[in-house]
A protein has these predicted regions:
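Bacterial Sec-dependent N-terminal signal peptides
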Residues: 1-54
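Alpha/propeptide regions of enzymes that mature by internal proteolysis
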Residues: 54-392
Length: 392
């Protein structure tokens, strides 16, 4: 039984703290008619309000995504990439500023792992709708390099995360003995104020350091973890999700990986594997948001941060093209780039390790533009699946 929650912000969505778990299982048979005939699609959706622990992913439930995944079906399938979380969950009941409940955190992404220290990668970024923030991107565009790890948190914690990263650089000699340096940490955000006491400012330096310390390769957690802990997506619980694709260009095998912090969209637009399930589920576990009478919030407002990693040798202008394909994956599952949404994306390549050189001319490799279609397709597919994984 699901009991109604009398909290002033959210009803019917109880605490996301364990051990309270809501499993919504809906088996829907949809008949889709087009010029080629009638297709019957059997779809199983399981949305689990969990913070940690073993849980199924979208493919485990039989959702038929397109494309071949890497070993972990994660951004960490791209060699060298490490991801870490700090997850902050505390309290229940009514939202009281400064007291909670707390549902927030920090996500850290290291393109070449934290042991590499200062090791810039070619990168570029793109914003579908800019009602949000990703710091450091003006220098990414200007220089063509991502020089720092990528951090993701909630809207009100961008500053503390940025400052903590800079302090960590000093404490760990990130620049390996250089006496004079400057940099612009890349910190992105989405708004978790519906499930989190966001104006209590609960993210602290210690949480940033924890996310950094926890960064590792291999299998990574999804859902209510890291910066995604308090996020909502397409009418249900959102959070952190990841996926990857492995493909060939001529005789070489490459990988594209995606990680998302998903906090966007209206339930009516939810689509899974091409099936418009949001229409069928429009009356399933609807929450009530008791906004002030003059609130300008519209259904579908929210944000999504997407980071794409690849080992394909790409130059910054080509990575811009990759970042511009990310919205196609977001749109497949129901994103519309609403006015109140911060849809901000960044793509980087781990190839060309010696490309950054302050003093000497360097020689780099780049894939021909005519060969990029598999990279585009892999990007769209990985983003689509990562978003659904964030909701499972």
């Amino acid at each position: 039984m699901i009991k109604e929650n009398k909290d002033p912000v959210i009803r019917k969505h109880r605490s996301i703290n364990r051990p309270f778990v809501i499993h919504i299982t809906s088996c829907t048979t949809l008949k889709l008619t087009n010029m080629k005939g009638i297709f019957t699609v059997f779809l199983v959706i399981l949305i689990s309000f969990q913070s940690y622990g073993q849980k199924p992913r979208a493919r485990d439930l039989g959702i038929p995504f397109v494309g071949k995944t890497g070993k972990f079906n994660a951004i960490t399938d791209v060699k060298g990439v490490e991801v870490g979380y700090s997850t902050i969950i505390s309290g229940n009941g009514e939202n009281i500023v400064g007291k909670g409940p707390i549902r927030t955190g920090v996500t850290a992404i290291f393109p070449r792992g934290k042991a590499k220290k200062f090791s810039p990668v070619y990168a570029n970024w793109y914003s579908l709708n800019g009602n949000g923030e990703m710091t450091g991107t003006t220098w990414v565009t200007e220089s063509g390099f991502l020089e720092t790890p990528i951090m993701i948190t909630n809207t009100n914690s961008v500053g503390v995360v940025r400052d903590a990263v800079l302090k960590w650089y000093v404490d760990t000699d990130w620049y390996s003995g250089e006496d004079w340096w400057y940099t612009y940490p890349v910190v992105a955000e989405t708004y978790d104020g519906f499930l989190n006491d966001i104006y209590g400012f609960h993210v602290e330096e210690k949480h940033v350091l924890e996310a950094i310390k926890n960064s590792s390769s291999g299998k990574i957690a999804e859902g209510n973890v890291g910066g995604g802990t308090g996020m909502m997506c397409l009418g249900y619980k959102g959070g952190t999700g990841t996926s990857s694709r492995v493909f060939k260009i001529k005789d070489s095998t490459y990988t594209v990986g995606a990680i998302v912090q998903s906090n966007f969209g209206a339930k009516r637009n939810l689509s899974i594997a091409g099936v418009p399930v949001g229409i069928e589920l429009k009356d399933t576990l609807n929450y009530v948001f008791n906004a002030p009478p003059k609130s300008r919030r519209q259904e579908g407002d929210g944000s999504i941060i997407v980071i794409i990693a690849t080992d394909v040798p790409l130059l910054p202008h080509q990575l811009k093209r990759i970042a511009q394909r990310i919205p196609l994956g977001v749109g497949i599952v129901g994103g519309r780039g609403s006015n109140g949404s911060g849809d901000i994306f960044l793509a980087f390549s781990t190839a060309n390790e010696s490309a950054f050189n302050r003093d000497e001319t360097t020689t780099v490799e780049s894939m021909s533009n005519d060969q990029l279609m598999p990279v585009f397709e892999a990007t769209v597919q990985a983003v689509e699946e990562a978003i659904i994984n964030a909701m499972i």
